[in-house]
A protein has these predicted regions:
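Flexible, membrane-associating and regulatory peripheral segments of lipid-active enzymes
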Residues: 5-9, 13-148
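Extended hydrophobic secondary-structure segments that form protein cores and membrane-embedded regions
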Residues: 112, 212-215, 243-247
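Surface cap/lid and interfacial helix-loop subdomains adjacent to catalytic sites
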Residues: 182-207, 228-411, 415-419, 425, ...
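Gly/Ala-rich beta-loop-alpha elbow adjacent to hydrolase catalytic centers
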Residues: 214-219, 223
Length: 445
C-alpha cells in the first residue's frame, strides 16, 4: 500500500486543480471505501477489447486480423465513430507524410492491457455486489493513445475494471487513508484468469500463446499485483511472458540486481527481472520494461514517481530505445515520439482533448486528420540515477524539442506522466516485436 501511495500522490495533487468539487454529504474516499467493502467478483469479465467481439472497439477478429475490409485497422468508439491508427510523420526539413497502420498477418502473441486512472466517477456509480462497469469512450480513448498500436503484433485484450476514480484518489491522499485498490486488482486478476483459461491457447495449434502485459499508472499497480500472484511464482506462466511494459509506476529491485531473488519483500518481483542487454547480449524476454518520464534540471530528483526510500533498493528504469539498439543502459538515444491527435481521442473545438480532458489538462494536441503525429528524432532519452540523502531515484530523462508538451509539465510533479507511453511509443512497439521474435525463436526445436 505504501508503494501505491508513493505512485499516486503526485498524480492526485495535480488533478486536485482541475477536478470537479464533490458533494458535501460524504468524501470520495469514504464512498470509495464503502464501495470496496461491499463489492464481490464480477459475474463475467467486461471486455472493452477482445478478439472476435461482434463490435470489437479494437477492430480485431478472433485471429487478430482487421474486422473491416482491407489491411488498415479500423477501431470503434463505444458511443459511435471510427478511428484509424495512422500517423503523420514529421522529419527535419520535410512536410508531414502519412503512414498507414496496417495488419497483414495474424498477430503471433497477445497483449493484456490495464489502462491508467481515467474515471472521474465510480464505474458503475453504485459499486455494490458484482455490478459490472460499463465500457466508455474515455477507456477507448486512452487505449488508442497508449496501446492500440501494439495491435499489429498482438491480439488485444483490454478489460474494463472498477478502478479507483480520480477524486477518490485525491481524497484518500488528503485524509491519509491511501488508495484501496482491492476491487481494481480483483477485476484485473479475474480478467487475466478468464483470458488464461479461455483465450491463451492458440486455436490452431492448441499451444499456449506468448503474452505482452501492458500497464500505466493505476494500471501498472494492478498489473504488477496480478503478475505477483499469477506469473512471478509460476514457472509455466513465466515461460509465456514475452515482456511486461509497466510504465508510470515504481517497480523496485535490490541494488545491483534485476529481481528480488526469491525472498526480498521490498522487491516488486522475485523472479521476473528488469530487461537488460549487456554487451550486445541476445534480446531478453520474460522481463520488465519500466520508467517514469521527466525532464529535470541537473541536481533535481522526481517528486515521487521513480523515487524510493526503501533501503538498498532502486526503481527500475529501462529505456526501450537503448535496449532495442543494444546500447548501454544509461545511453542517451533518440526516442520515437507518437503524439495522439485531437481526432484520435475524440476532441472537438469545445473540448479539444475530448474524454481525456482531465488527464491531458494543459496539453495542446495536434489537429491532424491522422491518429498520431510522429516525430522520430525530436526527443532523446536516457535513464538517470540520483540520490538526495533521503531517497534514490531513477527515471527516463527526456531532452530535445519539449515544445510538444505544456511548458510546466516536463519538470513538474508528475513530469510527462500522461505521455509515458507516447514519448517512446515507436520504440516500445518495435522492442516488443523484437522480443516476440526472440521468444518465438527460443521455442522452436
Amino acid at each position: 500500500m505504501d508503494a501505491v501511495r508513493r505512485l499516486l500522490i503526485p498524480v492526485a495533487a495535480v488533478l486536485a486543480l482541475v477536478l470537479l468539487p464533490t458533494s458535501a454529504g460524504a468524501s470520495p474516499a469514504s464512498v470509495s471505501a464503502a464501495a470496496v467493502q461491499g463489492t464481490r467478483p464480477l459475474d463475467r469479465t467486461v471486455w472493452l477489447c477482445r478478439p472476435g467481439l461482434v463490435h470489437n472497439p479494437c477492430g480485431q477478429d478472433a485471429e487478430g486480423m482487421p474486422q473491416s475490409a482491407g489491411p488498415e485497422l479500423v477501431t470503434h468508439y463505444p458511443s459511435g465513430g471510427t478511428r484509424l491508427l495512422d500517423a503523420t510523420r514529421f522529419t527535419a526539413g520535410a512536410s508531414g507524410r502519412r503512414e498507414p497502420f496496417t495488419v497483414t498477418g495474424k498477430p503471433p502473441v497477445d497483449c493484456f492491457y490495464a489502462y491508467p486512472t481515467v474515471d472521474l466517477l465510480p464505474n458503475p456509480p453504485l459499486q455494490t455486489g458484482g455490478r459490472p462497469p460499463v465500457p466508455r469512450d474515455v477507456h477507448h480513448a486512452v487505449t488508442l493513445m497508449q496501446s492500440a498500436r501494439f495491435a499489429g503484433l498482438c491480439r488485444m485484450f483490454v478489460p474494463v475494471y472498477r478502478q479507483v476514480p480520480l477524486p477518490a484518489l485525491l481524497a484518500g491522499i488528503v485524509v491519509g487513508s491511501g488508495a484501496d485498490l482491492t476491487t481494481a486488482t480483483m477485476d484485473i486478476r479475474d480478467a487475466w484468469d478468464d483470458y488464461w483459461t479461455h483465450d491463451n491457447r492458440d486455436p490452431e495449434t492448441g499451444e499456449r500463446r506468448g503474452v505482452v502485459i501492458l500497464g500505466h499508472s493505476q494500471g501498472t499497480a494492478v498489473a504488477a499485483a496480478l503478475m505477483r500472484e499469477r506469473v512471478d511464482e509460476h514457472p509455466g506462466v513465466r515461460r509465456q511472458l514475452v515482456v511486461a511494459a509497466l510504465l508510470g509506476g515504481n517497480i523496485e529491485v535490490p541494488e545491483g540486481r534485476d529481481a528480488g531473488g526469491g525472498a526480498d519483500p521490498a522487491s516488486t518481483f522475485q523472479h521476473i527481472p528488469a530487461c537488460r542487454r549487456p554487451g550486445g547480449a541476445p534480446m531478453p524476454t520474460g522481463c520488465v520494461v519500466s520508467y517514469a518520464t521527466y525532464s529535470l534540471p541537473r541536481g533535481s530528483l522526481p517528486a515521487v514517481i521513480g523515487r524510493t526510500a526503501s533501503p538498498g533498493h532502486r526503481v527500475v528504469c529501462v529505456n526501450p530505445a537503448a535496449l532495442l539498439r543494444g546500447e548501454a543502459a544509461g545511453a542517451r538515444v533518440p526516442l520515437d515520439l507518437y503524439l495522439p491527435t485531437r481526432r484520435l481521442i475524440g476532441g472537438s473545438a469545445l473540448l479539444p482533448n475530448g474524454p481525456l480532458a482531465v488527464p491531458l489538462n494543459g496539453y495542446q494536441l495536434p489537429d491532424l486528420p491522422t491518429g498520431f503525429a510522429r516525430h522520430p528524432d525530436a526527443l532523446t532519452g536516457e535513464c538517470t540515477h540520483a540520490t538526495d540523502g533521503t531517497a534514490s531515484a531513477d527515471w527516463l530523462q527526456v531532452g530535445g524539442d519539449l515544445s510538444h508538451f505544456p511548458a510546466s509539465a516536463p519538470a513538474g510533479l508528475t513530469g510527462l506522466h500522461a505521455m509515458d507511453f507516447n514519448v517512446a511509443q515507436g520504440d516500445l512497439v518495435a522492442l516488443a516485436a523484437a522480443q516476440t521474435r526472440a521468444w518465438l525463436d527460443r521455442r522452436r526445436p
